[in-house]
Design a protein with these regions (language model features):
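Active-site environment of divalent metal-dependent phosphoester hydrolases
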Residues: 13-17, 41-46, 64-70, 93-98, ...
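Short, structured coil segments at secondary-structure junctions
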Residues: 53-54, 127
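Pre-active-site segment of Zn-dependent metallo-hydrolases
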Residues: 16-27, 88-106
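N-terminal active-site segment of His-dependent metallophosphoesterases
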Residues: 1-52, 65-74, 83, 144-147
Length: 166
């Protein structure tokens, strides 16, 4: 059975919040088959480096990203990995009603990866849509820790979703 190892990151804010990604995140990039980045890069140099170091990158731009990043990345990135349909976006709006809004907005998605809030999130809607926000590896805001997520896709199933502290 083929397994795909995933790294989920968002809101990296390099170099405003950190000069670079933490070493543990670069280690996770090296181990991942696919890196999913849900926007707010800030500078294109980080995109260049991640494109060079990741085996595969699926990414979108965020509200803090400028013209070059918006030219190079979509607002919404869709990919199917081993039978699981992923959508990567930056913003999903306010917390109240998020599941209902996202279910209506993304009817053909199995897993929605998002960012913006810097607040980790892992829920599943009544229809089975999985909502994942990995938090931020560089800017914890009101959270106790900076974070990122890893997961595995195998046999058309998302497995082993883990929130990691930086």
């Amino acid at each position: 059975m083929l397994q795909v190892q995933l790294l989920l990151i968002a809101d990296t804010h390099v170099p405003k919040r950190a000069k670079d990604l933490p070493a543990v995140v670069w280690d996770a990039v090296a181990c991942a088959d696919v890196v999913l980045h849900a926007g707010d890069w800030i500078v294109p140099e980080l995109l260049d480096e991640l494109e060079g170091r990741a085996r595969r990158l699926v990414a979108c731009w965020g509200n803090n990203d400028g013209e070059e990043l918006r030219r190079r990345l979509p607002e919404r990135a869709d990919v199917a990995l081993e039978g699981v349909r992923f959508t990567v976006v930056h913003e999903t709006g306010q917390t109240p009603g998020r599941e209902a809004r996202m279910t209506a907005q993304y009817p053909d998605t199995d897993v929605l990866v998002f960012g913006h809030s810097h607040i980790p999130w892992d829920t599943t809607t009544e229809t089975g849509l999985r909502l994942l926000n990995p938090g931020s590896p560089t800017d914890r805001r009101s959270q106790p820790f900076c974070t990122y997520m890893t997961a595995t896709v195998a046999d058309s199933t998302l497995l082993d979703v883990v929130l990691h502290r930086v």
